[in-house]
Amino acid sequence: MNRYSIACATLFSLGYTLSPLSHAQEIANPDQWSPSRAAKISPVTQDQLNTADKNTTNFLLTNGNYAQTRFYPAKQINRDNVKKLHVAWIFQTQVKESLETSPIIVDGVMYVTTSFSHVYAIDAKTGEQLWHYSHKMGPITTYCCGPNNRGVQVLGDKVYLATLDSKLVALNAKTGEVVWTTDIADPELGYSETMAPTVVKDKVLIGTNGGEYGIRGFVRAYDAQTGKQVWNFDTIPENTVGVWATKDATGRDMHRDIQAEKDQLAKIGDPYKKLGGGVWQNPAVDLATNRIYFVVGNPSPDLDGSLRPGDNLYTDSLVSLDLDTGKYVCHFQYISHDVWDLDAVSPAVLVNVKDKSGKTIPGVIHAGKTGHIYVHDRKDCSLIRFSEAMVPQENMWTLPTKEGARMLPGANGGVEWSPIATDPGQDLAYAINLHQPMHYRVDSSPYPNGKLWLGGAFTAIPGEKQSGNITAVNYDTGKIKWQVKTPEPMIGGILATAGGLVFAGEGNGKFAAYNSSNGKELWSFHAGAGVNAPPSSYMVGGKQYIVVGAGGNTQVNFRRGNNIIAFTLE
Protein backbone atom coordinates (compact mmCIF):
# COMPACT_ATOMS: atom_id res chain seq x y z
CA MET A 1 0.00 0.00 0.00
CA ASN A 2 1.54 3.36 -1.02
CA ARG A 3 1.60 6.38 1.26
CA TYR A 4 -1.63 7.84 -0.14
CA SER A 5 -3.44 4.54 0.34
CA ILE A 6 -2.21 4.35 3.91
CA ALA A 7 -3.34 7.91 4.55
CA CYS A 8 -6.82 7.32 3.18
CA ALA A 9 -7.24 4.01 4.99
CA THR A 10 -6.11 5.55 8.25
CA LEU A 11 -7.95 8.85 8.08
CA PHE A 12 -11.25 7.57 6.81
CA SER A 13 -11.40 4.20 8.58
CA LEU A 14 -10.09 5.35 11.94
CA GLY A 15 -10.68 9.10 11.97
CA TYR A 16 -8.13 11.64 13.10
CA THR A 17 -7.64 12.22 16.82
CA LEU A 18 -4.72 14.11 18.34
CA SER A 19 -3.93 15.24 21.83
CA PRO A 20 -1.88 18.39 21.22
CA LEU A 21 -0.14 20.09 24.08
CA SER A 22 -2.23 22.79 25.66
CA HIS A 23 -1.23 26.12 24.13
CA ALA A 24 -1.52 29.51 25.76
CA GLN A 25 -2.02 32.83 24.05
CA GLU A 26 1.26 34.61 23.48
CA ILE A 27 2.98 37.38 21.57
CA ALA A 28 6.14 35.56 20.51
CA ASN A 29 9.49 37.35 20.29
CA PRO A 30 8.30 40.48 22.11
CA ASP A 31 11.71 42.05 21.48
CA GLN A 32 10.72 42.26 17.80
CA TRP A 33 7.44 44.01 18.58
CA SER A 34 7.36 47.76 19.17
CA PRO A 35 4.82 50.60 18.98
CA SER A 36 6.56 51.87 15.85
CA ARG A 37 6.08 48.50 14.16
CA ALA A 38 2.46 48.37 15.27
CA ALA A 39 1.85 51.83 13.84
CA LYS A 40 2.61 50.45 10.39
CA ILE A 41 -0.30 48.01 10.59
CA SER A 42 -3.26 49.50 8.73
CA PRO A 43 -6.96 48.94 9.42
CA VAL A 44 -9.16 47.52 6.68
CA THR A 45 -12.36 49.30 5.70
CA GLN A 46 -15.53 47.74 4.33
CA ASP A 47 -15.05 49.79 1.16
CA GLN A 48 -11.64 48.16 0.67
CA LEU A 49 -13.18 44.71 1.03
CA ASN A 50 -15.99 45.61 -1.38
CA THR A 51 -13.45 46.49 -4.09
CA ALA A 52 -10.86 43.82 -3.32
CA ASP A 53 -11.22 42.40 -6.83
CA LYS A 54 -9.63 45.59 -8.21
CA ASN A 55 -6.92 45.95 -5.55
CA THR A 56 -3.43 45.45 -7.02
CA THR A 57 -1.66 45.96 -3.68
CA ASN A 58 -3.38 43.72 -1.15
CA PHE A 59 -4.93 40.26 -0.87
CA LEU A 60 -7.76 40.92 1.57
CA LEU A 61 -9.91 37.78 1.58
CA THR A 62 -9.00 34.11 1.65
CA ASN A 63 -10.09 33.71 -1.97
CA GLY A 64 -9.09 37.20 -3.04
CA ASN A 65 -12.48 38.92 -3.03
CA TYR A 66 -16.10 38.37 -2.08
CA ALA A 67 -16.81 36.65 -5.41
CA GLN A 68 -13.98 34.19 -4.58
CA THR A 69 -12.49 34.32 -8.08
CA ARG A 70 -8.84 33.99 -6.92
CA PHE A 71 -7.91 36.28 -9.82
CA TYR A 72 -5.23 38.81 -8.90
CA PRO A 73 -5.35 41.92 -11.13
CA ALA A 74 -1.62 42.85 -11.08
CA LYS A 75 0.62 41.83 -13.98
CA GLN A 76 4.13 42.93 -13.06
CA ILE A 77 4.90 39.21 -12.91
CA ASN A 78 3.86 37.85 -16.31
CA ARG A 79 4.53 35.20 -18.93
CA ASP A 80 7.57 37.04 -20.26
CA ASN A 81 9.45 37.44 -16.99
CA VAL A 82 8.15 34.74 -14.64
CA LYS A 83 11.27 32.65 -15.36
CA LYS A 84 13.17 35.27 -13.29
CA LEU A 85 11.05 34.62 -10.20
CA HIS A 86 13.19 33.86 -7.15
CA VAL A 87 12.80 33.47 -3.39
CA ALA A 88 12.45 36.82 -1.62
CA TRP A 89 12.22 35.34 1.87
CA ILE A 90 11.19 32.22 3.80
CA PHE A 91 9.38 32.39 7.13
CA GLN A 92 9.37 29.30 9.34
CA THR A 93 6.45 28.80 11.69
CA GLN A 94 6.70 26.89 14.96
CA VAL A 95 4.24 24.25 13.75
CA LYS A 96 5.51 21.53 11.41
CA GLU A 97 2.19 20.08 10.34
CA SER A 98 -0.37 20.23 7.56
CA LEU A 99 -0.40 23.77 6.11
CA GLU A 100 -3.47 25.00 4.20
CA THR A 101 -3.37 28.74 4.93
CA SER A 102 -4.24 31.37 2.34
CA PRO A 103 -2.07 34.39 3.24
CA ILE A 104 -3.89 37.69 3.78
CA ILE A 105 -1.89 40.85 2.98
CA VAL A 106 -2.85 44.34 4.18
CA ASP A 107 -0.56 47.24 3.23
CA GLY A 108 2.68 45.34 3.69
CA VAL A 109 1.58 43.14 6.60
CA MET A 110 0.85 39.46 6.04
CA TYR A 111 -1.35 37.26 8.23
CA VAL A 112 -0.98 33.47 8.02
CA THR A 113 -2.24 30.57 10.10
CA THR A 114 -1.01 27.06 10.81
CA SER A 115 -2.43 23.82 12.13
CA PHE A 116 -3.69 24.01 15.72
CA SER A 117 -4.94 27.58 15.15
CA HIS A 118 -1.76 29.65 15.33
CA VAL A 119 -1.72 33.11 13.71
CA TYR A 120 1.39 35.01 12.60
CA ALA A 121 1.70 38.63 11.51
CA ILE A 122 4.70 39.05 9.20
CA ASP A 123 6.38 41.95 7.43
CA ALA A 124 5.40 41.14 3.83
CA LYS A 125 8.56 42.75 2.42
CA THR A 126 11.17 41.13 4.67
CA GLY A 127 9.51 38.07 6.17
CA GLU A 128 10.17 39.28 9.73
CA GLN A 129 7.70 38.25 12.41
CA LEU A 130 5.64 41.04 13.97
CA TRP A 131 3.60 38.96 16.40
CA HIS A 132 2.37 35.41 17.00
CA TYR A 133 -0.88 34.20 18.55
CA SER A 134 -1.07 30.60 19.77
CA HIS A 135 -4.59 29.55 20.64
CA LYS A 136 -5.12 27.80 23.96
CA MET A 137 -6.65 24.46 23.04
CA GLY A 138 -8.13 21.78 25.24
CA PRO A 139 -6.09 18.59 25.72
CA ILE A 140 -8.19 16.44 23.36
CA THR A 141 -9.98 17.43 20.18
CA THR A 142 -11.47 15.01 17.68
CA TYR A 143 -11.73 16.24 14.11
CA CYS A 144 -11.67 15.07 10.53
CA CYS A 145 -8.82 15.27 8.08
CA GLY A 146 -6.08 17.03 10.04
CA PRO A 147 -5.62 19.92 12.52
CA ASN A 148 -5.72 22.44 9.68
CA ASN A 149 -6.55 26.11 9.54
CA ARG A 150 -7.15 27.91 6.24
CA GLY A 151 -6.68 31.51 7.31
CA VAL A 152 -8.07 34.70 8.79
CA GLN A 153 -9.83 37.84 7.66
CA VAL A 154 -9.25 41.43 8.75
CA LEU A 155 -11.85 44.18 9.17
CA GLY A 156 -11.05 47.45 10.89
CA ASP A 157 -8.35 46.80 13.46
CA LYS A 158 -9.36 43.19 14.17
CA VAL A 159 -8.15 39.85 12.81
CA TYR A 160 -10.80 37.13 12.88
CA LEU A 161 -9.92 33.47 13.43
CA ALA A 162 -11.99 30.29 13.72
CA THR A 163 -10.27 27.61 15.81
CA LEU A 164 -9.97 23.86 15.76
CA ASP A 165 -11.87 23.60 19.05
CA SER A 166 -14.80 25.50 17.52
CA LYS A 167 -14.31 29.03 18.81
CA LEU A 168 -14.41 32.38 17.03
CA VAL A 169 -11.64 34.75 18.11
CA ALA A 170 -11.10 38.43 17.36
CA LEU A 171 -7.49 39.61 17.71
CA ASN A 172 -6.00 43.09 17.82
CA ALA A 173 -4.39 43.43 14.39
CA LYS A 174 -1.48 45.46 15.79
CA THR A 175 -0.57 43.25 18.75
CA GLY A 176 -2.20 39.84 18.35
CA GLU A 177 -3.93 40.21 21.70
CA VAL A 178 -7.42 38.74 22.14
CA VAL A 179 -10.29 41.25 21.90
CA TRP A 180 -13.10 38.74 22.32
CA THR A 181 -13.79 35.00 22.06
CA THR A 182 -17.08 33.25 21.28
CA ASP A 183 -17.93 29.55 21.52
CA ILE A 184 -19.36 28.33 18.21
CA ALA A 185 -20.24 24.73 19.11
CA ASP A 186 -19.17 21.83 21.34
CA PRO A 187 -16.03 20.13 19.94
CA GLU A 188 -16.74 16.99 21.97
CA LEU A 189 -19.84 16.47 19.82
CA GLY A 190 -17.69 16.48 16.68
CA TYR A 191 -17.79 20.18 15.76
CA SER A 192 -14.56 21.87 14.64
CA GLU A 193 -13.42 24.82 12.54
CA THR A 194 -10.77 24.90 9.83
CA MET A 195 -12.21 27.50 7.44
CA ALA A 196 -11.33 31.18 7.42
CA PRO A 197 -14.12 33.51 8.53
CA THR A 198 -15.75 35.82 6.00
CA VAL A 199 -16.40 39.31 7.36
CA VAL A 200 -18.89 41.58 5.60
CA LYS A 201 -21.17 44.43 6.72
CA ASP A 202 -19.99 44.01 10.32
CA LYS A 203 -20.93 40.33 10.31
CA VAL A 204 -18.54 37.40 10.71
CA LEU A 205 -19.81 34.44 8.67
CA ILE A 206 -18.72 30.94 9.62
CA GLY A 207 -19.77 27.35 8.89
CA THR A 208 -18.71 24.19 10.70
CA ASN A 209 -16.88 20.92 10.16
CA GLY A 210 -18.11 17.63 11.58
CA GLY A 211 -20.03 15.83 8.84
CA GLU A 212 -18.22 12.62 9.77
CA TYR A 213 -19.39 12.85 13.40
CA GLY A 214 -23.17 13.09 13.29
CA ILE A 215 -23.42 16.85 13.86
CA ARG A 216 -26.19 19.11 12.60
CA GLY A 217 -24.46 21.56 10.28
CA PHE A 218 -24.99 25.30 10.12
CA VAL A 219 -23.84 28.66 8.81
CA ARG A 220 -23.90 31.52 11.31
CA ALA A 221 -23.34 35.25 11.43
CA TYR A 222 -21.75 36.93 14.44
CA ASP A 223 -21.45 40.61 15.27
CA ALA A 224 -17.93 41.67 14.30
CA GLN A 225 -17.64 44.08 17.24
CA THR A 226 -19.02 41.95 20.07
CA GLY A 227 -18.97 38.32 18.93
CA LYS A 228 -22.69 37.91 19.63
CA GLN A 229 -24.66 35.65 17.28
CA VAL A 230 -26.80 37.55 14.76
CA TRP A 231 -28.45 34.68 12.91
CA ASN A 232 -28.23 30.92 12.37
CA PHE A 233 -29.12 28.80 9.35
CA ASP A 234 -29.28 25.03 9.85
CA THR A 235 -27.94 23.28 6.77
CA ILE A 236 -30.09 20.34 7.87
CA PRO A 237 -33.75 21.45 8.07
CA GLU A 238 -36.28 19.62 10.24
CA ASN A 239 -37.74 18.03 7.10
CA THR A 240 -34.88 16.54 5.09
CA VAL A 241 -36.87 14.14 2.90
CA GLY A 242 -36.92 16.23 -0.29
CA VAL A 243 -38.37 14.92 -3.55
CA TRP A 244 -37.02 11.35 -3.49
CA ALA A 245 -34.69 12.11 -6.40
CA THR A 246 -33.37 9.09 -8.28
CA LYS A 247 -30.82 10.82 -10.52
CA ASP A 248 -27.82 13.03 -9.82
CA ALA A 249 -27.21 16.50 -11.27
CA THR A 250 -25.88 15.00 -14.50
CA GLY A 251 -28.87 12.69 -15.01
CA ARG A 252 -27.21 9.43 -13.92
CA ASP A 253 -29.25 6.91 -11.94
CA MET A 254 -28.18 6.55 -8.29
CA HIS A 255 -29.78 3.11 -7.77
CA ARG A 256 -31.90 4.15 -4.79
CA ASP A 257 -34.54 1.83 -3.37
CA ILE A 258 -37.14 4.52 -2.74
CA GLN A 259 -39.77 2.21 -1.26
CA ALA A 260 -37.29 0.76 1.22
CA GLU A 261 -36.31 4.29 2.25
CA LYS A 262 -39.95 5.29 2.73
CA ASP A 263 -40.54 2.21 4.88
CA GLN A 264 -37.49 3.06 6.96
CA LEU A 265 -38.62 6.67 7.35
CA ALA A 266 -41.92 5.43 8.76
CA LYS A 267 -39.99 3.38 11.33
CA ILE A 268 -37.30 5.80 12.50
CA GLY A 269 -38.53 9.25 11.51
CA ASP A 270 -36.40 12.08 10.13
CA PRO A 271 -32.85 11.94 11.60
CA TYR A 272 -32.18 15.66 11.07
CA LYS A 273 -30.54 16.25 14.46
CA LYS A 274 -27.49 14.15 13.56
CA LEU A 275 -27.48 14.23 9.75
CA GLY A 276 -24.16 16.03 9.18
CA GLY A 277 -24.07 18.71 6.52
CA GLY A 278 -20.88 20.51 7.47
CA VAL A 279 -19.68 23.56 5.56
CA TRP A 280 -15.96 23.30 4.82
CA GLN A 281 -15.33 26.51 2.93
CA ASN A 282 -16.22 30.19 2.72
CA PRO A 283 -19.43 31.61 1.29
CA ALA A 284 -19.28 33.88 -1.73
CA VAL A 285 -20.98 37.25 -1.20
CA ASP A 286 -23.02 39.04 -3.86
CA LEU A 287 -22.99 42.64 -2.69
CA ALA A 288 -25.46 43.72 -5.38
CA THR A 289 -28.22 41.40 -4.20
CA ASN A 290 -27.19 41.06 -0.54
CA ARG A 291 -27.01 37.28 -0.83
CA ILE A 292 -24.42 34.64 0.03
CA TYR A 293 -23.70 31.33 -1.72
CA PHE A 294 -22.04 28.30 -0.15
CA VAL A 295 -21.88 24.55 -0.55
CA VAL A 296 -22.81 21.91 2.03
CA GLY A 297 -20.96 18.67 2.73
CA ASN A 298 -21.94 15.05 3.21
CA PRO A 299 -24.67 13.48 5.34
CA SER A 300 -23.88 11.36 8.43
CA PRO A 301 -23.07 8.53 8.46
CA ASP A 302 -21.17 8.85 5.20
CA LEU A 303 -21.75 5.42 3.69
CA ASP A 304 -24.75 3.90 5.48
CA GLY A 305 -27.87 5.35 3.91
CA SER A 306 -30.22 2.99 5.75
CA LEU A 307 -30.04 5.22 8.83
CA ARG A 308 -31.02 8.38 6.93
CA PRO A 309 -33.86 7.80 4.43
CA GLY A 310 -34.77 10.59 2.02
CA ASP A 311 -32.77 13.12 0.01
CA ASN A 312 -31.00 14.38 3.16
CA LEU A 313 -31.48 18.09 2.48
CA TYR A 314 -29.38 20.28 2.19
CA THR A 315 -26.35 18.01 2.06
CA ASP A 316 -24.31 17.95 -1.16
CA SER A 317 -25.95 21.21 -2.21
CA LEU A 318 -25.36 24.77 -3.31
CA VAL A 319 -27.36 27.05 -0.98
CA SER A 320 -28.11 30.78 -1.10
CA LEU A 321 -29.22 32.91 1.86
CA ASP A 322 -30.07 36.53 2.56
CA LEU A 323 -26.98 38.13 4.10
CA ASP A 324 -28.83 40.29 6.63
CA THR A 325 -31.25 37.68 7.98
CA GLY A 326 -29.85 34.26 7.10
CA LYS A 327 -33.17 33.36 5.47
CA TYR A 328 -33.20 30.66 2.80
CA VAL A 329 -33.44 31.83 -0.82
CA CYS A 330 -32.69 28.81 -3.01
CA HIS A 331 -30.66 25.62 -3.30
CA PHE A 332 -29.58 22.96 -5.77
CA GLN A 333 -28.71 19.43 -4.65
CA TYR A 334 -26.00 17.66 -6.66
CA ILE A 335 -26.35 14.21 -5.08
CA SER A 336 -29.42 13.21 -3.12
CA HIS A 337 -28.94 10.58 -0.40
CA ASP A 338 -25.15 10.52 -0.93
CA VAL A 339 -23.55 7.23 0.20
CA TRP A 340 -20.12 7.87 -1.38
CA ASP A 341 -18.90 11.06 0.40
CA LEU A 342 -18.73 12.80 -2.97
CA ASP A 343 -20.05 15.96 -1.38
CA ALA A 344 -19.69 19.67 -2.10
CA VAL A 345 -16.64 21.24 -0.43
CA SER A 346 -14.72 23.52 -2.83
CA PRO A 347 -16.01 27.10 -2.37
CA ALA A 348 -18.63 28.61 -4.67
CA VAL A 349 -17.43 31.32 -7.08
CA LEU A 350 -19.44 34.22 -8.55
CA VAL A 351 -18.83 34.99 -12.23
CA ASN A 352 -20.88 36.12 -15.20
CA VAL A 353 -21.83 33.13 -17.34
CA LYS A 354 -23.73 32.32 -20.52
CA ASP A 355 -27.16 30.82 -19.92
CA LYS A 356 -28.64 28.14 -22.17
CA SER A 357 -29.74 30.75 -24.71
CA GLY A 358 -26.30 32.37 -24.83
CA LYS A 359 -27.28 35.41 -22.77
CA THR A 360 -24.75 36.64 -20.20
CA ILE A 361 -26.19 36.51 -16.67
CA PRO A 362 -24.88 36.54 -13.09
CA GLY A 363 -23.77 32.99 -12.35
CA VAL A 364 -22.25 30.87 -9.61
CA ILE A 365 -19.92 27.94 -10.26
CA HIS A 366 -18.77 25.06 -8.09
CA ALA A 367 -16.13 22.38 -8.69
CA GLY A 368 -17.40 19.08 -7.32
CA LYS A 369 -15.80 15.94 -5.98
CA THR A 370 -17.53 14.22 -8.89
CA GLY A 371 -14.99 15.88 -11.20
CA HIS A 372 -17.45 18.28 -12.85
CA ILE A 373 -17.63 22.06 -12.68
CA TYR A 374 -21.28 23.00 -12.22
CA VAL A 375 -22.61 26.30 -13.61
CA HIS A 376 -25.71 27.86 -12.02
CA ASP A 377 -28.04 30.82 -12.46
CA ARG A 378 -27.33 33.03 -9.45
CA LYS A 379 -30.97 34.14 -9.26
CA ASP A 380 -32.55 30.78 -8.44
CA CYS A 381 -29.61 28.33 -8.06
CA SER A 382 -30.82 26.34 -11.08
CA LEU A 383 -28.24 24.34 -13.02
CA ILE A 384 -27.31 25.67 -16.46
CA ARG A 385 -24.65 23.12 -17.39
CA PHE A 386 -21.93 20.89 -16.05
CA SER A 387 -18.46 20.45 -17.49
CA GLU A 388 -16.76 17.48 -19.01
CA ALA A 389 -15.33 15.21 -16.32
CA MET A 390 -11.88 16.35 -15.22
CA VAL A 391 -11.00 12.94 -13.74
CA PRO A 392 -11.78 9.30 -14.63
CA GLN A 393 -15.27 8.14 -13.67
CA GLU A 394 -16.08 4.46 -13.33
CA ASN A 395 -19.01 2.47 -11.90
CA MET A 396 -20.96 5.58 -10.88
CA TRP A 397 -23.16 5.18 -8.79
CA THR A 398 -22.33 1.68 -7.58
CA LEU A 399 -23.71 1.20 -4.07
CA PRO A 400 -21.23 0.40 -1.28
CA THR A 401 -21.24 -3.23 -0.16
CA LYS A 402 -19.98 -5.14 2.88
CA GLU A 403 -17.20 -6.56 0.70
CA GLY A 404 -16.31 -3.22 -0.86
CA ALA A 405 -17.35 -1.81 -4.24
CA ARG A 406 -14.88 -0.13 -6.60
CA MET A 407 -15.85 3.32 -7.91
CA LEU A 408 -14.17 6.36 -9.37
CA PRO A 409 -13.74 9.10 -8.30
CA GLY A 410 -12.58 8.13 -4.81
CA ALA A 411 -13.99 9.87 -1.77
CA ASN A 412 -11.50 12.77 -2.00
CA GLY A 413 -12.70 13.63 -5.51
CA GLY A 414 -12.49 14.99 -8.11
CA VAL A 415 -11.93 18.36 -6.53
CA GLU A 416 -11.52 18.38 -2.75
CA TRP A 417 -11.81 21.49 -0.56
CA SER A 418 -9.26 23.17 -2.85
CA PRO A 419 -10.53 26.56 -4.08
CA ILE A 420 -10.57 27.09 -7.84
CA ALA A 421 -9.51 30.24 -9.69
CA THR A 422 -11.07 31.99 -12.66
CA ASP A 423 -9.95 34.31 -15.44
CA PRO A 424 -12.97 36.39 -16.51
CA GLY A 425 -11.21 37.59 -19.66
CA GLN A 426 -10.93 34.01 -20.92
CA ASP A 427 -14.13 32.58 -19.34
CA LEU A 428 -11.95 29.91 -17.76
CA ALA A 429 -12.06 28.18 -14.40
CA TYR A 430 -8.91 26.47 -13.13
CA ALA A 431 -9.17 23.49 -10.80
CA ILE A 432 -6.72 21.02 -9.29
CA ASN A 433 -7.82 17.40 -9.30
CA LEU A 434 -7.28 14.07 -7.56
CA HIS A 435 -7.44 10.57 -9.05
CA GLN A 436 -7.54 7.99 -6.25
CA PRO A 437 -9.34 4.70 -7.00
CA MET A 438 -11.15 3.49 -3.88
CA HIS A 439 -13.25 0.71 -2.47
CA TYR A 440 -16.50 1.76 -0.76
CA ARG A 441 -17.56 -0.57 2.06
CA VAL A 442 -20.73 -0.23 4.15
CA ASP A 443 -20.97 -1.38 7.76
CA SER A 444 -23.97 -0.21 9.76
CA SER A 445 -23.39 1.12 13.27
CA PRO A 446 -25.42 3.27 15.69
CA TYR A 447 -24.69 6.94 16.37
CA PRO A 448 -21.58 7.05 18.62
CA ASN A 449 -22.21 10.42 20.34
CA GLY A 450 -19.70 12.71 18.67
CA LYS A 451 -17.20 10.08 17.56
CA LEU A 452 -16.30 9.16 13.99
CA TRP A 453 -19.38 7.79 12.22
CA LEU A 454 -18.68 6.71 8.67
CA GLY A 455 -21.01 3.72 8.47
CA GLY A 456 -18.22 1.80 6.75
CA ALA A 457 -14.97 2.81 5.10
CA PHE A 458 -13.51 4.08 1.86
CA THR A 459 -9.94 3.00 1.23
CA ALA A 460 -7.49 3.49 -1.60
CA ILE A 461 -6.90 0.35 -3.65
CA PRO A 462 -3.35 -1.06 -3.28
CA GLY A 463 -1.41 -1.15 -6.53
CA GLU A 464 -3.69 1.22 -8.45
CA LYS A 465 -2.00 4.35 -9.75
CA GLN A 466 -2.90 7.67 -8.17
CA SER A 467 -2.33 10.98 -9.90
CA GLY A 468 -3.63 14.51 -10.36
CA ASN A 469 -4.39 17.24 -12.87
CA ILE A 470 -4.47 20.96 -13.29
CA THR A 471 -7.50 21.59 -15.49
CA ALA A 472 -8.79 24.67 -17.31
CA VAL A 473 -12.52 24.57 -18.12
CA ASN A 474 -14.52 27.02 -20.21
CA TYR A 475 -17.53 27.55 -17.97
CA ASP A 476 -19.63 28.94 -20.84
CA THR A 477 -19.33 25.69 -22.81
CA GLY A 478 -18.36 23.09 -20.21
CA LYS A 479 -15.43 22.04 -22.38
CA ILE A 480 -11.95 21.34 -21.03
CA LYS A 481 -9.52 23.74 -22.72
CA TRP A 482 -6.30 22.25 -21.37
CA GLN A 483 -5.09 19.84 -18.74
CA VAL A 484 -1.70 19.19 -17.14
CA LYS A 485 -1.10 15.76 -15.60
CA THR A 486 0.72 15.57 -12.26
CA PRO A 487 2.35 12.48 -10.73
CA GLU A 488 0.45 12.79 -7.44
CA PRO A 489 -3.08 13.78 -6.40
CA MET A 490 -3.56 17.56 -6.18
CA ILE A 491 -4.94 19.26 -3.09
CA GLY A 492 -4.52 22.86 -1.91
CA GLY A 493 -5.70 25.50 -4.37
CA ILE A 494 -4.68 27.65 -7.31
CA LEU A 495 -4.22 31.33 -8.21
CA ALA A 496 -4.73 33.13 -11.55
CA THR A 497 -3.24 36.54 -12.33
CA ALA A 498 -3.61 39.31 -14.89
CA GLY A 499 -0.09 38.45 -16.00
CA GLY A 500 -1.52 35.47 -17.89
CA LEU A 501 -0.39 32.96 -15.27
CA VAL A 502 -1.75 30.35 -12.92
CA PHE A 503 0.21 29.14 -9.89
CA ALA A 504 -0.27 25.79 -8.17
CA GLY A 505 1.70 23.45 -5.93
CA GLU A 506 2.04 19.68 -5.60
CA GLY A 507 2.52 17.26 -2.72
CA ASN A 508 6.05 16.45 -3.85
CA GLY A 509 7.11 20.04 -3.13
CA LYS A 510 6.89 21.44 -6.64
CA PHE A 511 5.44 24.94 -7.01
CA ALA A 512 4.99 26.10 -10.59
CA ALA A 513 3.66 28.82 -12.87
CA TYR A 514 1.74 27.94 -16.02
CA ASN A 515 0.53 29.85 -19.05
CA SER A 516 -3.15 30.40 -18.23
CA SER A 517 -4.19 30.03 -21.88
CA ASN A 518 -2.56 26.70 -22.72
CA GLY A 519 -1.11 25.16 -19.53
CA LYS A 520 2.53 25.36 -20.61
CA GLU A 521 4.85 25.28 -17.59
CA LEU A 522 6.94 28.48 -17.45
CA TRP A 523 8.70 28.28 -14.07
CA SER A 524 9.02 25.98 -11.06
CA PHE A 525 10.58 25.78 -7.62
CA HIS A 526 11.04 22.86 -5.21
CA ALA A 527 9.93 23.73 -1.69
CA GLY A 528 11.09 20.59 0.13
CA ALA A 529 7.64 19.90 1.62
CA GLY A 530 4.21 19.52 0.10
CA VAL A 531 2.78 22.72 -1.39
CA ASN A 532 -0.84 22.06 -0.50
CA ALA A 533 -2.11 25.57 0.22
CA PRO A 534 -3.72 28.24 -1.97
CA PRO A 535 -1.21 30.86 -3.21
CA SER A 536 -1.74 34.60 -2.79
CA SER A 537 -0.21 37.67 -4.44
CA TYR A 538 0.46 41.25 -3.36
CA MET A 539 2.53 44.38 -4.03
CA VAL A 540 4.88 46.10 -1.60
CA GLY A 541 7.65 48.60 -2.30
CA GLY A 542 6.66 48.67 -5.96
CA LYS A 543 7.27 44.93 -6.41
CA GLN A 544 4.77 42.12 -6.94
CA TYR A 545 5.14 38.98 -4.85
CA ILE A 546 3.69 35.48 -4.98
CA VAL A 547 3.42 33.73 -1.61
CA VAL A 548 2.47 30.18 -0.65
CA GLY A 549 2.66 27.82 2.31
CA ALA A 550 4.78 24.65 2.08
CA GLY A 551 3.83 22.38 4.95
CA GLY A 552 2.34 19.28 3.38
CA ASN A 553 -1.06 17.79 4.05
CA THR A 554 -2.52 15.33 6.54
CA GLN A 555 -5.46 14.21 4.44
CA VAL A 556 -3.32 12.89 1.58
CA ASN A 557 -0.22 12.42 3.76
CA PHE A 558 2.19 14.67 1.90
CA ARG A 559 5.54 15.57 3.44
CA ARG A 560 5.20 18.05 6.30
CA GLY A 561 7.01 21.33 6.67
CA ASN A 562 6.59 24.78 8.20
CA ASN A 563 7.56 27.32 5.55
CA ILE A 564 5.82 30.39 4.17
CA ILE A 565 7.71 31.25 0.97
CA ALA A 566 7.50 34.57 -0.88
CA PHE A 567 8.79 35.03 -4.43
CA THR A 568 9.51 38.14 -6.48
CA LEU A 569 11.41 39.16 -9.60
CA GLU A 570 15.12 39.93 -9.65
Q: What role is predicted for each listed range?
A:
Residues 91-102, 132-153, 181-196, 234-282, ...:
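Extracytoplasmic beta-rich repeat domains
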Residues 25-73, 237, 251-252:
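N-terminal pre-domain segments of enzymes
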Residues 88, 128-132, 177-181, 230-232, ...:
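A structural motif specific to WD40 beta-propellers
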Residues 171, 217-228, 311-326, 380-381, ...:
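Beta-propeller blade signature
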Residues 68-185, 496-497:
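N-terminal cofactor/phosphate-binding cores enriched in small/glycine residues
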Residues 59-63, 98-118, 143-167, 192-216, ...:
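Repeat-blade elements of multi-bladed beta-propeller folds
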Residues 296, 359, 434-435, 462-520:
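Loop/turn-rich, solvent-exposed surfaces of beta-rich toroidal or solenoidal domains
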Residues 8-20:
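Bacterial N-terminal signal peptides
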